Amino acid sequence: VSIRDLIKSAMRMRPDRIIVGEVRGVESVDMIQAMSSGHDGSISTGHSGSPEEMLSRLETMVLMGTDIPLMAIRKQIASAIDIIVQLERLRDKSRRVTEITEVVGYEDGEIRLNPLFIFKEVAEDKVENVVREEGCYEKIEDEVSGRLIYSGNRLIHRKKLEAAALQLEGGL
């Protein structure tokens, strides 16, 4: 049984959302269609170096499974995906969220993005003794220190959150 078959079977069950562990190929066509057909809150993962690269990979995977023109694929991706959460494995082998980006829409032949949060590393000389929940009071050697910084960009598509009765805090 392929992932494509599983996504199609899940669609027949009329779920509220669909979660696919990872898209690697033509099953991305079905995942995008599921996300575009009223399954808000659906989630999937993929591997790339940045949100822009993920969109490019997704376009390529969809092209492998269909004969749809690139413009139509980009429009469908832009309407299906709301947020991209980028994780990276850092030099200390930890995995961190390094970017949270809103997919704004399709304009001038491209999918437009709105970066909301970006991981900023703290310089080594600015990190002294770090308090950890476990009780360690000194910095672990070679550990990457940093945090997600709000970009200052406001979330553009707020109506979906409001429709779900969710409130945003602060200036986002």
What annotation goes with each model-predicted range?
Residues V1-S9:
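Nucleotide-state-sensitive switch-loop elements of NTP-binding domains
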Residues S2, P69-L70, Q167:
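General structural signal for secondary-structure boundaries
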Residues L6, I18, L116-I118:
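Intrinsic disorder/low-structure terminal segments
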Residues A10-D108:
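Conserved P-loop NTPase nucleotide-binding/switch module
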Residues K93, E99-L172:
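NTP-binding/hydrolysis catalytic cores, primarily Walker-type P-loop NTPases
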